[in-house]
């Protein structure tokens, strides 16, 4: 087995890149686009799938930390290739109060645009992006699929946005 087959994490979009706009469903009757949040920071949390233990813990942590994200006026969007109905059941079961977006059809299109799609598995990487108010990638992180990346990196990136905006 080669190292490439053991660790095939994606190379996310570079810092300074304009974040690709997208429109994905959050419910059967509502779609969310990145551009609707222009003027405020956005956190994109790509995750492999609803119901897995690590994804469940990661999303529960973000629900707990949501008030901290909101102090920076940041919007949190969870994204996986699961369908809307799976997301709705998962959010209800886990008491999640932020949008979970279905990158379902065409499967992984947004994850591919952000260079975090795992084609062999048909899921996205466990990847995080912080996008500034102008729609520019300011921070990204790809975690091993079995590792919860936590929220510290996100909070540091949001703090840095605030410092950049103040100077």
Question: For the regions a protein language model found, what residue spans apply to each?
Answer:
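Chalcogenol-based redox active-site neighborhoods
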Residues: 1-167
């Amino acid at each position: 087995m080669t190292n490439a087959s053991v660790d095939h994490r994606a190379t996310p979009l570079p810092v300074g890149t304009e974040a690709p706009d997208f429109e994905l469903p959050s419910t059967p009757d509502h779609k969310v686009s990145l551009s609707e949040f222009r003027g405020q920071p956005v956190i994109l949390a790509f995750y492999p799938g609803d119901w897995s233990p690590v994804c469940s813990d990661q999303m529960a942590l973000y629900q707990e930390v949501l008030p901290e994200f909101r102090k920076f006026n940041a919007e949190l969007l969870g994204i996986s290739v699961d369908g809307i109905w799976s997301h709705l059941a998962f959010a209800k079961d886990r008491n999640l109060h932020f949008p979970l977006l279905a990158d379902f059809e065409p499967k992984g299109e947004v994850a591919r645009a952000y260079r975090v799609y795992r084609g062999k598995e048909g899921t996205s990487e466990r990847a995080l992006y912080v996008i500034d108010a102008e729609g520019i990638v300011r921070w990204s992180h790809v975690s091993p699929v079995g590792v919860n990346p936590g929220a510290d990196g996100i909070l540091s990136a949001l703090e840095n946005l605030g410092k950049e905006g103040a100077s």
